Amino acid sequence: MMKGGLAGLMKQAQQMQEKMKTAQAELAALEVNGQAAGGLVKVAISGKYELKRVQIDPGAMDDREMLEDLIVTAYTEAFKQVEAASTQLMSGATAGMPMPPGFKLPF
């Protein structure tokens, strides 16, 4: 019985590994947008948190400190979207596998 249980667990782990690869590929292809001040500043980041684009409305260029804050705000918004997508994709990949409390994927 122990052998069958172990084989089942190994099969489940292999399935989870395949689902994880798929989820990671989806994350790598993901691109999300964040914006601040009604679109004065827009950023696009990848599912790997890489900054892809920054668009700044000319009206936001007058105040450097405000512009810096708007860039951070737009990036933070996009970052949160990637976090949510990552959590959703990874929870789907690990569905049915017991995970320790606080265990976060991807590593």
From Swiss-Prot:
Binds to DNA and alters its conformation. May be involved in regulation of gene expression, nucleoid organization and DNA protection. Homodimer. It holds the Pfam family YbaB_DNA_bd. HAMAP family: DNA_YbaB_EbfC (MF_00274). The keyword DNA-binding applies. This is Nucleoid-associated protein Pnuc_0701. It comes from the Bacteria. InterPro entries: YbaB-like_sf, YbaB/EbfC. The keyword Cytoplasm applies. GO terms for cellular component: bacterial nucleoid; cytosol. Belongs to the YbaB/EbfC family. It is found in: Cytoplasm, Nucleoid. Keywords: Cytoplasm, DNA-binding. PANTHER family: NUCLEOID-ASSOCIATED PROTEIN YBAB (PTHR33449:SF1). One of its GO terms (molecular function) is DNA binding. It comes from Polynucleobacter asymbioticus (strain DSM 18221 / CIP 109841 / QLW-P1DMWA-1).
